[in-house]
């Protein structure tokens, strides 16, 4: 089956976007998503995004990590899809309905209200998500938030001093997190600026993670460390996060279209039906 796809990125967090709203249905398996995401033998991406018809929105967005796992939300991908759909769109996801709009070269997306209850993260057992009584070497007492997908946030003196490539996979797969977890290490520079690095569940170290920026910002606001809006700078560049309790998170940042091409999906594995 020949399909058209778009290569896009948000601050270096890159995607293969397949728009199947007006085509024959595209079957996306974990194996096929892994093959397409492979940077040596596939197209290459952090996440594969499949757009399908929706009865309640402009599109239904499904998100597959590079390891083939299907996940609930991706902030950078949402901005890219809003841009692809013309700059104003309502998008159906597993995490809920998201709305976005673009202006002055930036895309803003409402990502819903964060959740902080331990069972909404989810955690394996009850604890205070404002200062979890756990540690992995020098990383200790994280905060936790679910912003459509699960995150822990460690506030540290210097993000670059943390061996996130080593500690990230340990924390991601710890039994405390039954759905695995995205791992954020953040340094608060002042009340308007945070620096952030992210180990993304199912992906690894990434140049940018929109939901990670959101989880970190709302955690810092919750702890009284910063004001809103706050600028969160990742290795790929900055995002602006605006949030107050009782309101949805609004994330603003760029979305870049790199190229459009076609590929034969049969080269990346057979459909499950044969």
Swiss-Prot record:
The organism's place on the tree of life at top rank: Bacteria
Pathway in which this enzyme or protein is active: Amino-acid biosynthesis; L-lysine biosynthesis via DAP pathway; DL-2,6-diaminopimelate from LL-2,6-diaminopimelate: step 1/1
GO MF term list: diaminopimelate epimerase activity
Gene Ontology CC, one term: cytosol
Binding-site list for substrate: 13, 47, 65, 75-76, 149, 182, 200-201, 210-211
UniProt site positions, description: Could be important to modulate the pK values of the two catalytic cysteine residues: 151, 200
Subcellular localization(s) per the UniProt record: Cytoplasm
InterPro entries found in the cross-reference section: DAP_epimerase_AS, DAP_epimerase_DapF
Keyword terms, alphabetized: Amino-acid biosynthesis, Cytoplasm, Isomerase, Lysine biosynthesis
Enzyme Commission code(s) on record: 5.1.1.7
Record's function text: Catalyzes the stereoinversion of LL-2,6-diaminopimelate (L,L-DAP) to meso-diaminopimelate (meso-DAP), a precursor of L-lysine and an essential component of the bacterial peptidoglycan.
UniProt-listed NCBIfam families: DapF
Subunit structure of this chain's protein: Homodimer.
Protein's name in the database: Diaminopimelate epimerase
Organism: Rhizorhabdus wittichii (strain DSM 6014 / CCUG 31198 / JCM 15750 / NBRC 105917 / EY 4224 / RW1) (Sphingomonas wittichii)
